[in-house]
Amino acid sequence: MTKSAELYQKAQTTIPGGVNSPVRAFNGVGGSPIFIDRADGALIFDADGKAYIDYVGSWGPMILGHNHAVIREAVIQAAQRGLSFGAPTEMEITMAELVSELVPSMEQLRMVNSGTEATMSAIRLARGYTGRDKIIKFEGCYHGHADSLLVKAGSGALTLGQPSSPGVPADFAKHTLTARFNDLDSVRELFAANQGEIACIIVEPVAGNMNCIPPVEGFHEGLREICDQEGALLIFDEVMTGFRVALGGAQAHYNIKPDLTTLGKVIGGGMPVGAFGGRREVMQYIAPTGPVYQAGTLSGNPIAMAAGYACLNLLREEGNEKRLAAKTKQLADGFKSLADQHGIPLLVHQVGGMFGFFFTEQETVTCYEDVARCDVERFKRFFHLMLQHGVYLAPSAFEASFTSLAHGSKEIEATLEAADRSFAILAAEAKA
């Protein structure tokens, strides 16, 4: 038995399912999860000492690579001055100014501790600002585990085969309306049936929790137009796409200005940080300047702010945005080319520093219904073949994968060699 298997067995005694977030349990791919001991650059090392090229990146935050020396030093320096104060610090201002500079639609913002906190708070603010209760989200999109957002959700909820979670009262769920991603008509129908009742639309601008699905042409422009016509707010959940799809987020990439934006993952440089922000007049509704309450003991934590500030400053250096996108495109194109060579039907999507692939003969995958028709069993087999060859992909067919600036030509070539061998095995098995 491996050390990882021993740890997993031991963990299940005191931790439900042996993990602190469901997707880590490998339920989506089968088998026993690997337990990580350390990480550096593009590599993670498991409890048995085996190295893997990592395309999970802590589910997105490690955009510079693991254990970056500058971020590590920023954390050490901040920790020497104190771990938490529960009072304002100058670094919170500095960090907010930098985020607002990089994402100009966020004229004001509030720091929180996670993406879930950010989306939960943004929804509450939208309801308070508009005086309306209902919200629209999209089937297969995941916005954290707040009750009102666990309705036809993506991510781990899809892996469990249970998109709407038990424990969410019907009285909460009835205020959450679901539309089809990339389908403006489904959005218009909801507004027509709920005149003057919808506070906001919340959307992942690139759906990263049913793998990786970009918007079709005109989709975001249509959402912006509908919100303007109906007096609703448009919320971009950029927890995953923020600073990764482009330095200014997906809203910069697609040239759309949302009313509110939520951030997480990259903004903390590996520390637990989230943020929500947007138009000044909307943000003024948050306490203490307005009536909508939101608070957090550890919000704006000085160590987390130091890590996030160091990360974003490094990321904004000239050329990094293009380098990250180029690395990711090279990898995505390589996967597609190799799959074609081996006769494996594969559809690959890539936007900036995130990518995803679907084992399917469909020509397009644009929504949850398309994702549900993909070959999950073949993905499971491919995942374990790649793992055996030292490549760690997201352990779910419904999760996007991520590159970092630490992924060099050596790591990408090794990954494509592993993919070549894995596709060859899949092809041979299909003929057997």
Swiss-Prot record:
SUPFAM superfamilies: PLP-dependent transferases
Subunit details: Homodimer.
Single GO molecular function: pyridoxal phosphate binding
Cited NCBIfam families: hemL, PRK00062.1
GO cellular component: cytoplasm
GO terms (BP aspect): protoporphyrinogen IX biosynthetic process
Source organism of the structure: Vibrio cholerae serotype O1 (strain ATCC 39315 / El Tor Inaba N16961)
Keywords, alphabetical: Cytoplasm, Isomerase, Porphyrin biosynthesis, Pyridoxal phosphate
Pathway it works in: Porphyrin-containing compound metabolism; protoporphyrin-IX biosynthesis; 5-aminolevulinate from L-glutamyl-tRNA(Glu): step 2/2
Top-level lineage group: Bacteria
Listed name of the protein: Glutamate-1-semialdehyde 2,1-aminomutase
